[in-house]
Regions:
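Conserved CoA-thioester-binding segment of acyl-CoA-metabolizing enzymes
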Residues: 14, 26-83, 117
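Crotonase-fold acyl-CoA enzyme core
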Residues: 117-233, 257, 261-265, 270-273, ...
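Glycine- (often His-adjacent) and acidic-residue-rich active-site loop
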Residues: 69, 84-118, 134, 162, ...
Length: 286
């Protein structure tokens, strides 16, 4: 479908992938800073630097990019989620030890901004499962996801101003678009942390759960999304992102063309027939 070409093809060939089966979970190894698990149709990527509060080093960033590419390229994966290990932090930001000597050339590299863009442009739905601190670059990774789910103990901030810099991973552009200009400016300029309740109120997150319910909720959402016709979530993503960056009239026109394209699919016929016959649809992505 031409209108789905809005998403760039960032997938690549990944080698040295080894599968390990354990209690229904498939674990893809060969990573040092992250974990990659398949749970049904869900690809769960876990930042695993607990002693560093899951701070995102350059090597961690490289692995995250690889993991997203693996999930995007895997036909068995329908939903992608990112979380943090340890129960105290999603990601406390970039690894500051690597920021100290960062020069202009390095500052202009995509770094976290590139990962967030990759998550945003991946046709498959992406979730950020947040438990604990979600700060700086960690928040910017979460902002690149389609949905953000958090536990009650989670806190959010863009504290870069206290370090004499500004966010460089996309927060100045994405945060105001997600929470509005007022709260976007509040969080960016003040740099103060907000709690999960406030994050829910302003739309930074859309679901708030107890800590022991975070993974079950992510799995439940993934199962729900996996039951949809494959073209639906990817087209919905394309429409929303295009609509946010275009005129209302242009977005409405493209929506009509997108609807027209989906109406011609076999999945549309299956969906309507299943509804009329009061049965569960069997979508094939055709």
């Amino acid at each position: 479908m031409l209108l789905l070409s809005y998403f760039s093809d960032d997938t690549g060939n990944i080698s040295l992938v080894r599968l390990k089966h354990f209690v229904g979970i498939v674990n893809i190894m060969k990573f040092e800073n992250i974990l990659y698990d398949n749970i049904g149709k869900l690809a769960l990527i876990t930042i695993n630097r607990v002693q560093k509060h899951n701070a995102i080093s350059l090597s961690t960033l490289e692995e995250l990019n690889q993991a997203v590419e693996i999930a995007a390229d895997d036909e068995n994966v329908r939903v992608l989620a990112i979380t943090g290990a340890g129960g105290k932090a999603f990601a406390a930001g970039a690894d500051l030890n690597e920021v100290v000597d960062r020069d202009l050339r390095k500052a202009l590299d995509p770094i976290i901004q590139g990962l967030a863009l990759k998550l945003e442009r991946t046709p498959k739905p992406t979730l950020a499962a947040i438990d604990g601190f979600c700060m700086g670059g960690g928040l910017e990774v979460a902002l690149g996801c389609d949905l953000r789910i958090a536990t009650h103990q989670s806190k959010f901030a863009t504290p870069e101003g206290k370090l004499g810099i500004i966010p460089g991973g996309g927060a100045t552009a994405r945060l105001p678009r997600i929470v509005g200009r007022g709260w976007g400016m509040e969080m960016l300029i003040m740099g103060e942390a907000i709690d999960a309740k406030r994050a829910l109120q302003i739309g930074l997150i859309t679901r708030l759960v107890d800590q022991d319910q975070l993974l079950p909720e992510v799995i439940r959402i993934a199962e729900h999304l996996s039951e949809l016709a494959p073209f639906v979530p990817r087209t919905m993503k394309a429409m929303v992102h295009f609509g946010m960056d275009s005129s209302l009239s242009g977005a409405l026109m493209l929506e009509k063309y997108a609807q027209g394209a989906l109406i011609q699919t076999e999945d549309k016929k299956e969906g309507l027939n299943a509804f009329l016959e009061k049965r569960k649809p069997v979508f094939k992505g055709k």
